[in-house]
Amino acid sequence: MKNEIQDGLGSALILVAKNHGIDIRLLDQAIEIERCKDPENGDFASNIALKYAKVFKMKPRQLADELVVSVPLMDSVAGMEVAGPGFINIRLSRESITAVLENVVAKKERYGCFENPNARKILVEFVSANPTGPLHVGHGRGAAYGDSLSRLLIANGHQVDREYYINDFGRQMDILALSVYWRYVQECGIGVALPKGIYQGDYVIDIAKKLKEKEGKRLAYPVNEWAPDYPQTWTQEQVDNGDRDRWIDGAIAGLKEKLGQKEYRGVFDLALSMELDDIRGDLEEFGVFFDRWFSERSMSENDMINNALKKVDEAGYLYEKDGAVWFKSTAFGDEKDRVVRRKNGMTTYFSSDISYHFDKYNRGYDQMIDILGADHHGYMARVRASLAALGLDPEKLVIALVQFAVLYKGGEKMQMSTRSGEFVTLRDLREHVGADAARFFYVMRKPEQHLDFDLDLAESNSKDNPFYYVEYAHARCCGMLNKAEEEGYEFSPEAALKCRNALVEPEETALISELHRYPEVVIAAGKQMAPHQVIIYLKELATRWHHYYDVGHKVLHEDEEIRNARLLLTWAVRQVLRNALAIIGVQARERM
């Protein structure tokens, strides 16, 4: 319908241009129409006359008058009128207004989903938290956003793969293995106090107990046989000057030497597998499923990192300085060059990033979306620079930054830290407010905006809680349809379509207009990678429905035509609420 109106205005514009001797090649601006905020003004409005008044050398109202009389007849349009300085207000016919109900009935859960002739193959990588501990509430926001965005892109007709990048190769995983082994020797009765700076949480003890269950005490060696002496506490100066980190690296090296490669890998792999299982289960209970779990270690084992660096070198963008190998990222606009291989010959995290994104391109994706924490703000320039150095199109890579969420309970901020063990996990949050409420609140704001997550609000059963307010609207629809069945009224949405033009109340027209808007919201939100727009829409539709319900329009009316029409409207509102909630991965409640 919107396209039909735009085409009609376009035809009128060309006709008026020819009448005035205007070169139609000057008519190069898009014809925009927007929904009227005030229904008294009509259904749609266009500023086309204001945009082209100078080209036609006419006053906007004069041009608008000529355009209105030149628009071809359209069944969907009841009339057009000029308003204000030259806006064209458009009123739809009653038949076209209520036709959306036929569309909702025909498509049901597919209403708001599209077949896209320009569909792209898209890879969305998100969460990708180090498997060094349980997911915390900060990771939860990235999970909710990434999964909702994936669902939104699928609704827009794209082929989407979800991917989790496993950081299973590097120092942080070695620190986890060290932490687990330290707890293991404690479990075996020969350990000493756990030093600061390694992982402290109870989950480390769980892995250590599993290690003891599997190996007994055969791998337990006193700490003084493999770890250098350390102070009971680290001073801030020792932390700042790197003494603590050097001690940790020394302890890791000593443990590897003491256990040998095979036994150390066994400790490492046990810690990795248990943490990955925990993360995978946590995410699945949160409604997030990945198509692929991509291992960083697999790139090293398959020599993918060295091969990618070789290609960058062959392109002339690597050089040696101070014993290290550097990438000339400044040649592509980055603020400084980046180390890809340290003095000790080890590759850096950035080298893995280069290899990983090179592999993504080789898999044939049209677009790759990386969803990262806001602390990765400097990441985009260096990765895009590496892609350009490899002769690849850096514009295919989109990086979305997500601010971490901060939890509040009783007005007080809650803290979280993985190493110290004093963190609020995603599992804690799910058990506290439920997965659906958590996802709703996570996606409610733009991802780049700071999010204060009010636990008290998320748990409240009041209209101030947007999650409850939207779910209650769906439950009210279900309640009304159930009541109709209980009272013996026969209702079928397909059969009730013939009654749809009985929906003449202003509140009914407003609700139908909201249903019309839903596909437009899905398209706009998809283009902008903005699932929060779906929640804005949900709140607006819920508000319209609650108002309609509260003003007292009797759905189970004595008049059969009115009753069936209103039940049809109720059914359609329920369906669209359900569809929109599905975009953000939230179950629609039938009872509150």
Curated annotation (Swiss-Prot):
Listed InterPro entries: aa-tRNA-synth_I_CS, Arg-tRNA-ligase, Arg-tRNA-synth_N, Arg-tRNA-synth_N_sf, ArgRS_core, DALR_anticod-bd, Rossmann-like_a/b/a_fold, tRNAsynth_Ia_anticodon-bd
Sorted UniProt keywords: Aminoacyl-tRNA synthetase, ATP-binding, Cytoplasm, Ligase, Nucleotide-binding, Protein biosynthesis
GO cellular component terms, semicolon-separated: cytoplasm
Residues annotated as signal peptide: none
An annotated Gene Ontology molecular function: ATP binding
Catalyzed chemical reaction(s): tRNA(Arg) + L-arginine + ATP = L-arginyl-tRNA(Arg) + AMP + diphosphate
HAMAP family reported in the protein's UniProt record: Arg_tRNA_synth
Family affiliation: Belongs to the class-I aminoacyl-tRNA synthetase family.
SUBUNIT field: Monomer.
Entry-linked PANTHER family: ARGININE--TRNA LIGASE, CYTOPLASMIC, ARGINYL-TRNA SYNTHETASE
This protein's name: Arginine--tRNA ligase
Organism: Dichelobacter nodosus (strain VCS1703A)
Highest classification ranks of the organism: Bacteria, Pseudomonadati, Pseudomonadota, Gammaproteobacteria, Cardiobacteriales
